[in-house]
From Swiss-Prot:
A GO CC term attached to the entry: focal adhesion
Positions of the UniProt region annotated as Disordered: 316-350
Modification after translation (UniProt): Phosphorylated on serine and threonine residues.
Keyword line: Acetylation, Actin-binding, Cytoplasm, Cytoskeleton, Disease variant, Phosphoprotein, Repeat
Post-translational modification N-acetylserine, affected residues: S2
InterPro entries with a match to the protein in the record: ADF-H, ADF-H/Gelsolin-like_dom_sf, Twinfilin
Protein name per UniProt: Twinfilin-1
Species annotation: Homo sapiens
Modified residues (Phosphoserine): S143, S277
Known partners and oligomeric status: Interacts with G-actin; ADP-actin form and capping protein (CP). May also be able to interact with TWF2 and phosphoinositides, PI(4,5)P2. When bound to PI(4,5)P2, it is down-regulated. Interacts with ACTG1.
Transmembrane segments: none
């Protein structure tokens, strides 16, 4: 189902999703068990959506166990009934569980059908995802007023279940929650790329030592970029894309997240997916790096000159996406997926 964590939907889930989209159910609770998405419980409507909401949703929320809940509204769009997607990640749940559910969220939405999901609500306490909490969420979405400190904290957690902690004394960034620092060597390489002293930086996660380290800074031309993508392990890449556009010479920094699918362990896929947003936030916020485009690929063959150009200078702007999947050669691709970056809250999102 997804290369982000390797979690797949059971056949029962797929069948129930199909019936749910036709309006049969009011609520579905989905959990991860034995590396599969499974249905924990489901309910049929008994009243209007707002009268059903609290009595259906709140009893299903466990204090130490994340889950997903799909709650059907009474309204419809062109694709059918509209749904609320609730991501429940309680404060007292295990960090590994938080990471796993965060990294699998996009794949569940894709399996269900993103066009059916009207709103997404994230919660760490029941008040966040109660009917009152949902109405507050709707109000905050329609209001131009700035977020409160608590709302901003929840927004950041929604992006990923790990927080960023800047070490003032050590001058390196720490991914709190999974406690993966960026090595000084890697951080300095990113600074050099931002100052145009390098044109390529590759980072990897040293899983054993729990640190993001520098893997490669080889001077790289566009034609050589596919060769930099490992076939058996995940990597983060920052590439200075030098090109011309409408008569102007441009140097654009592109972020590439390469994940070769099931040749990587589930833990590796989970960690790379979970750490990605925080890494980008550090780079963009602390280094003031202007990352023009964020791309996810399965293999280096997808990085053609035409693809990079079209991604940096898209012909249509109907729907802006933080991460974009390349079209790639037929037969060489895994399942398509979209992943959101930190600069764009999951309003589009693995």
């Amino acid at each position: 189902m997804s290369h982000q964590t390797g979690i797949q939907a059971s056949e029962d889930v797929k069948e129930i999703f199909a019936r749910a989209r036709n309006g049969k159910y009011r609520l579905l609770k989905i959990s991860i068990e034995n590396e599969q998405l499974v249905i924990g419980s489901y309910s049929q409507p008994s009243d209007s959506w707002d009268k059903d909401y609290d009595s259906f949703v709140l009893p299903l929320l466990e204090d130490k166990q994340p889950c997903y809940i799909l709650f059907r509204l009474d309204s419809q769009n062109a694709q059918g009934y509209e749904w609320i997607f609730i991501a429940w990640s309680p404060d007292h749940s295990h960090v590994r569980q938080k990471m796993l559910y965060a990294a699998t969220r996009a794949t569940l939405k894709k399996e269900f059908g993103g066009g059916h999901i009207k709103d997404e609500v994230f919660g760490t306490v029941k008040e966040d995802v109660s009917l009152h909490g949902y109405k507050k969420y709707l109000l905050s979405q329609s209001s131009p007023a700035p977020l409160t400190a608590a709302e901003e904290e929840l927004r950041q957690i929604k992006i990923n279940e790990v927080q960023t902690d800047v070490g003032v004394d050590t001058k390196h960034q720490t991914l709190q929650g999974v406690a993966f620092p960026i090595s000084r060597e890697a951080f300095q390489a990113l600074e050099k790329l931002n100052n145009r002293q390098l044109n390529y930086v590759q980072l990897e996660i040293d899983i054993k030592n729990e640190i993001i380290i520098l893997a490669n800074t080889t001077n790289t031309e566009l034609k050589d970029l596919p060769k930099r993508i490992p076939k058996d392990s995940a990597r983060y890449h920052f590439f200075l894309y030098k090109h011309s556009h409408e008569g102007d010479y441009l140097e654009s920094i592109v972020f590439i997240y390469s994940m070769p699918g099931y040749t990587c362990s589930i833990r590796e896929r989970m960690l790379y997916s979970s750490c990605k947003s925080r890494l980008l936030e550090i780079v963009e916020r602390q280094l003031q790096m202007d990352v023009i485009r964020k791309i996810e690929i399965d293999n280096g063959d997808e990085l053609t000159a035409d693809f990079l150009y079209e991604e940096v200078h898209p012909k249509q702007h109907a729907h802006k996406q933080s991460f974009a999947k390349p079209k790639g050669p037929a037969g060489k691709r895994g399942i398509r997926r979209l992943i959101r970056g930190p600069a764009e809250t999951e309003a589009t999102t693995d």
